């Protein structure tokens, strides 16, 4: 009981200190942003005057109001008013926007294969009665007790699955039941899917595959069990009255 009170007081002090630091707001520094003293380039109104001679319609060396070396009002090296490398109008360099976009990095392209793989991992597989597909694993290194099977596995491991099908661990009373069910559904699905592609498995393949999948299912059970207990511990922690009171007080301080 004493330890519980001590832990509650420590948590209260920690949250109070954290909230005090989080509520401190930085005051903006006086002055403007970068280069507020005026531009050093032509035609931009520097208070101290430009360092270049006054120009009529265009920039330095421009007869017709364009950028440097432009006869007809475009960007640098543009004959017809477009971005650099664009002969007939447009935006900034290599794109249809303004010149302010020249230095913007291009947006990374989304790899749809990675998105699909991330969505499939841990998701419920349709048509399999609530089974989920685990994340990809490295195939385990297994010794089968004889040189022939060891060599056969090394040469053919790419033909065996690197993901397993499983149900949530809370549906099983122990690890053995989870692993047994996981092995059966994974081997069945892999053999059926691969057979439809014209590839057949021998008895040696099935024997080795069952051993490999068994090790992967054990690993999957350990991962799921650890995550399950962590979720349970988090629920117990945040459902206790002292923690609820402290969280409510913290929200009040932030919102207020």
Swiss-Prot record:
InterPro entries: Prion, Prion/Doppel_b-ribbon_dom_sf, Prion/Doppel_prot_b-ribbon_dom, Prion_copper_b_octapeptide, Prion_N. Residues 28-110 are annotated as: Disordered. Cu(2+) 3 binds at residues 80-82. PROSITE patterns: PRION_1, PRION_2. Disulfide bonds join 182-217. It is found in: Cell membrane; Golgi apparatus. Residues 1-24 form the signal peptide. One of its GO terms (molecular function) is identical protein binding. Changing residue 171 to Q: Linked to susceptibility to scrapie. It comes from the Eukaryota. Sequence repeats lie at residues 54-62, 63-70, 71-78, 79-86, 87-95. Residues 25-233 are annotated as: Interaction with GRB2, ERI3 and SYN1. Residues 234-256 form a propeptide. It holds the Pfam family Prion_bPrPp. Residues 55-97 have a biased composition (Gly residues). Residues 54-95 are annotated as: 5 X 8 AA tandem repeats of P-H-G-G-G-W-G-Q. Keywords: Amyloid, Cell membrane, Copper, Disease variant, Disulfide bond, Glycoprotein, Golgi apparatus, GPI-anchor, Lipoprotein, Membrane, Metal-binding, Prion, Repeat, Signal, Zinc. It is linked to Found in high quantity in the brain of humans and animals infected with degenerative neurological diseases such as kuru, Creutzfeldt-Jakob disease (CJD), Gerstmann-Straussler syndrome (GSS), scrapie, bovine spongiform encephalopathy (BSE), transmissible mink encephalopathy (TME), etc. This protein is produced by a bicistronic gene which also produces the major prion protein/PRNP from an overlapping reading frame. The alternative prion protein/AltPrP (AC F7VJQ3) and PRNP have no apparent direct functional relation since a mutation that removes the start codon of the AltPrP has no apparent effect on the biology of PRNP. In mouse and hamster, the alternative initiation AUG codon is absent and is replaced by a GUG codon. Belongs to the prion family. Its primary physiological function is unclear. Has cytoprotective activity against internal or environmental stresses. May play a role in neuronal development and synaptic plasticity. May be required for neuronal myelin sheath maintenance. May play a role in iron uptake and iron homeostasis. Soluble oligomers are toxic to cultured neuroblastoma cells and induce apoptosis (in vitro). Association with GPC1 (via its heparan sulfate chains) targets PRNP to lipid rafts. Also provides Cu(2+) or Zn(2+) for the ascorbate-mediated GPC1 deaminase degradation of its heparan sulfate side chains. The normal, monomeric form has a mainly alpha-helical structure. The disease-associated, protease-resistant form forms amyloid fibrils containing a cross-beta spine, formed by a steric zipper of superposed beta-strands. Disease mutations may favor intermolecular contacts via short beta strands, and may thereby trigger oligomerization. Contains an N-terminal region composed of octamer repeats. At low copper concentrations, the sidechains of His residues from three or four repeats contribute to the binding of a single copper ion. Alternatively, a copper ion can be bound by interaction with the sidechain and backbone amide nitrogen of a single His residue. The observed copper binding stoichiometry suggests that two repeat regions cooperate to stabilize the binding of a single copper ion. At higher copper concentrations, each octamer can bind one copper ion by interactions with the His sidechain and Gly backbone atoms. Monomer and homodimer. Has a tendency to aggregate into amyloid fibrils containing a cross-beta spine, formed by a steric zipper of superposed beta-strands. Soluble oligomers may represent an intermediate stage on the path to fibril formation. Copper binding may promote oligomerization. Interacts with GRB2, APP, ERI3/PRNPIP and SYN1. Mislocalized cytosolically exposed PrP interacts with MGRN1; this interaction alters MGRN1 subcellular location and causes lysosomal enlargement. Interacts with KIAA1191. This is Major prion protein. The gene is PRNP.
């Amino acid at each position: 009981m004493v330890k519980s009170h001590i832990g509650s007081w420590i948590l209260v002090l920690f949250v109070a200190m954290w909230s005090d630091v989080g509520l401190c707001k930085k005051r903006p520094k006086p002055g403007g942003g970068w280069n507020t003293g005026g531009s050093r380039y032509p035609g931009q109104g520097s208070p101290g005057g430009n360092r270049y001679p006054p120009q009529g319609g265009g920039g330095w060396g421009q007869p017709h109001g364009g950028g440097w070396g432009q006869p007809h009002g475009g960007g640098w090296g543009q004959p017809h008013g477009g971005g650099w490398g664009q002969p007939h109008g447009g935006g900034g360099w290599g794109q249809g926007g303004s010149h302010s976009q020249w230095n913007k990095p291009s947006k990374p392209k989304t790899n749809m294969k990675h998105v699909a793989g991330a969505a499939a991992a841990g998701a419920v597989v349709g048509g399999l009665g609530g089974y989920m597909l685990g994340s990809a694993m490295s195939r385990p290194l297994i010794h089968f007790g004889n040189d022939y099977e060891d060599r056969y596995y090394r040469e053919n491991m790419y033909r065996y699955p690197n993901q397993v099908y499983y149900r949530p661990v809370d549906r099983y009373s122990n690890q053995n039941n989870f692993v047994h069910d996981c092995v059966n559904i994974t081997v069945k699905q892999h053999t059926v899917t691969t057979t439809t592609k014209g590839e057949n498995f021998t008895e040696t393949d099935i024997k080795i595959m069952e051993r490999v999948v068994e090790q992967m299912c054990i690993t999957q059970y350990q991962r799921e069990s650890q995550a399950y207990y962590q979720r349970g511990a988090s629920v117990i922690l945040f459902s206790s009255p002292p923690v609820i009171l402290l969280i409510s007080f913290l929200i009040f301080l932030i919102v207020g």
